[in-house]
């Protein structure tokens, strides 16, 4: 019974960490990454379609993303969708492939990004703590229903705190790595 509660807590906290990592991948850090264009969809015969379903996306150089559509008639739509994406990226096309050069980040932009990354990690920590609160409420309910003893309640709350601390540490590690990546010139 408590094992199910802990498994649920770990699962939900793991999802919070995964969401943070996904959000971090979408940030433009001055380095080319396929994940920068992951969320972009282009119109293809009237249907919004993910870029990775329309083209081969590669990183030929550290600051360049190359998009090679399988159907060259969709190049114009891909360019429009990249410009509309609010990522601040400018696509250049030669009719066969689209190249996106990632500009070097200024010192001010780097500091702004570090603040954004810090805020995202704090939001993830809040999510993890909210999950801890929910789990502790479940444990208290089990105690009220006499399904567990008082000793088991305190041990369960200690275990919940240990799980929470583990995930907070993981969030800090992910944050530190992203901060280092952003500040790296």
UniProtKB/Swiss-Prot annotation:
Pfam family, one: RRF
Protein's UniProt keywords contain Protein biosynthesis: yes
Example GO biological process: translational termination
Coiled-coil regions, chain positions: none
Primary site of residence: cytoplasm
Cellular localisation: Cytoplasm
Sorted UniProt keywords: Cytoplasm, Protein biosynthesis
Function recorded in the entry: Responsible for the release of ribosomes from messenger RNA at the termination of protein biosynthesis. May increase the efficiency of translation by recycling ribosomes from one round of translation to another.
Family: Belongs to the RRF family.
Protein name stated in the entry: Ribosome-recycling factor
Organism this protein belongs to: Syntrophobacter fumaroxidans (strain DSM 10017 / MPOB)
Gene that produces this protein: frr
């Amino acid at each position: 019974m408590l094992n199910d509660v802990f498994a649920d807590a770990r699962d939900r906290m793991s999802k919070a960490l995964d969401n943070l990592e996904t959000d971090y991948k979408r940030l433009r850090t001055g380095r080319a990454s396929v994940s920068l264009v992951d969320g972009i969809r282009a119109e293809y015969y009237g249907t919004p379609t993910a870029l990775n379903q329309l083209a081969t996306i590669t990183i030929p150089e550290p600051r360049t993303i190359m998009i090679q559509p399988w159907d060259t008639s969709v190049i114009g739509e891909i360019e429009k969708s990249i410009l509309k994406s609010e990522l601040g990226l400018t696509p250049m096309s030669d009719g066969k492939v689209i190249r996106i050069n990632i500009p070097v980040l200024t010192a001010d932009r780097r500091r702004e990004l570090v603040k954004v990354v810090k805020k995202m990690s704090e939001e993830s920590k809040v999510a993890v703590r909210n999950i801890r609160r929910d789990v502790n409420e479940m444990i208290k309910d089990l105690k009220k229903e006499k399904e567990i003893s008082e000793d088991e309640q305190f041990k369960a709350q200690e275990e919940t705190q240990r799980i929470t601390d583990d995930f907070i540490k993981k969030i800090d590690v992910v944050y530190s790595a992203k901060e280092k990546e952003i500040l790296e010139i």
